[in-house]
């Protein structure tokens, strides 16, 4: 987990966000990087920021927006601009906290989402009960990759990661990193 703790990835800390993407890609070389912005992030800005990195290894997969069904209309009205942007930009929309809602309430929300975004796949059933094919479908089958024997060999051999010329921007960033290190966020440190 790589956390931007101050500012917004879609506006005020855009440069930090973009440099973090490159740093993560160049140091960890992940197959996938999941960006989980706060609920008030402007999704279209984040997508534009990722696309503006201009690095062929980094591309945006179909965005997934998760919406609390119980507060759907409240937040749609209270944070209209951000809410509408997240719904319009999503390829998949998953309702959460649906277990105590009636089918009629869920269908009302579904119809309202359809008025905003006719193309998104809208999932109104409880995601806790879904199988692996559901989760794979969120990313058009791209989430689970077959492991090659080369990749398995690399995983077995990899025991450490080192950085050259690493530095913290300020003491607060260093303290944050050291706290995460002590808490085991970066694996077993011997």
Question: Predicted regions span which residues?
Answer:
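A short alpha->loop->secondary-structure connector
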Residues: 51-60, 83-85, 110-117
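Flexible active-site lid/hinge loop adjacent to a nucleotide/diphosphate
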Residues: 73, 77-89, 93
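Short, well-ordered beta-strand core segments
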Residues: 63, 93-94
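Conserved nucleotide-binding/hydrolysis micro-motifs of P-loop NTPases
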Residues: 39-41, 69-73, 98-102, 128-131
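C-terminal accessory "lid"/substrate-recognition subdomains
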Residues: 88-92, 100-190
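Short amphipathic alpha-helical segments
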Residues: 45-48, 77-78, 106-108
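Nucleotide-state-sensitive switch-loop elements of NTP-binding domains
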Residues: 1-74
């Amino acid at each position: 987990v790589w956390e931007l703790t101050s500012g917004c990835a879609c506006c005020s800390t855009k440069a930090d966000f973009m440099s973090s993407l490159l740093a993560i890609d160049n140091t960890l070389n992940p197959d996938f990087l999941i960006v989980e912005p706060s609920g008030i992030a402007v999704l279209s800005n984040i997508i534009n920021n990722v696309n503006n990195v201009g690095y062929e290894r980094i591309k945006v997969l179909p965005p997934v927006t998760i919406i609390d069904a119980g507060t759907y209309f409240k937040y749609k009205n209270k944070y209209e601009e951000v809410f509408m942007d997240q719904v319009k930009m999503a390829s998949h929309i998953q309702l959460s906290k649906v277990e105590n809602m009636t089918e009629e309430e869920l269908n009302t929300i579904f119809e309202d989402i359809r008025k905003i975004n006719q193309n998104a796949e809208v999932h109104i059933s409880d995601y806790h009960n879904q199988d692996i094919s559901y989760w794979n479908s969120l990313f058009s089958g791209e989430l689970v990759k077959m492991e090659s024997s080369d990749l398995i060999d690399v995983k077995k051999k990899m025991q450490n990661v080192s950085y050259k010329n690493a530095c913290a921007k300020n003491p607060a960033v260093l303290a944050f990193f050291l706290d995460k290190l002590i808490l085991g966020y970066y694996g077993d440190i011997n």
